[in-house]
Amino acid sequence: MYPAEITEPCRQDLTGAGFVELRTPADVDLAMKNPTGTMLLVINSVCGCAAGMARPGAKLAIQHTRVPDRTATVFAGVDREATERARSYMPGYAPSSPSIALFKDGKLVYMMERWQIEGRGPQEIAYDLVEAFDQFCQGV
């Protein structure tokens, strides 16, 4: 478990942008049992690629005109059971953090794994997310 002085700023980076934190398996199930519409789920991490790439990219992407109906996050390595439950909704993908998933009507429609995040800037990540939003989300 990581100390709070490390994890809290990582949490607040997303929750401060409106992402709902899912800290327990029940939280995840509740979010996933509302299958209507779209939900962006960020699997957060304390690693540098989460801090410098994934979180900034996700926050930038949700400034677009077409955005998911809901945004949520689980914290890998901290809220382990919640993260494991979230990953159970992503069949066919190996555990990866950070990662970003888009669900539509309860089904996984887009997945950005760690290897697609590493070495890229926030704008590049946001661009890919915005393309997925344009394909799967309604306009504002």
Residues covered by each model-derived region:
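Thiol-based oxidoreductase modules, predominantly thioredoxin-like and allied folds used
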Residues: 43, 66-85
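Short, well-ordered amphipathic alpha-helices
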Residues: 57-59, 86-87, 133
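N-terminal leader/targeting and pre-domain segments
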Residues: 1-38, 137-140
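Short His-Asn-centered micro-motif
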Residues: 24, 43-44, 52, 74
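Non-catalytic, surface beta->alpha helical segment in thiol-disulfide oxidoreductase systems
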Residues: 93-140
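Typically the conserved alpha-helix immediately C-terminal to a functionally engaged Cys/Sec
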Residues: 51-64
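Short acidic (Asp/Glu) patches
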Residues: 83-97
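Short active-site neighborhood of thiol/selenol oxidoreductases, capturing the structured segment around
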Residues: 35-47
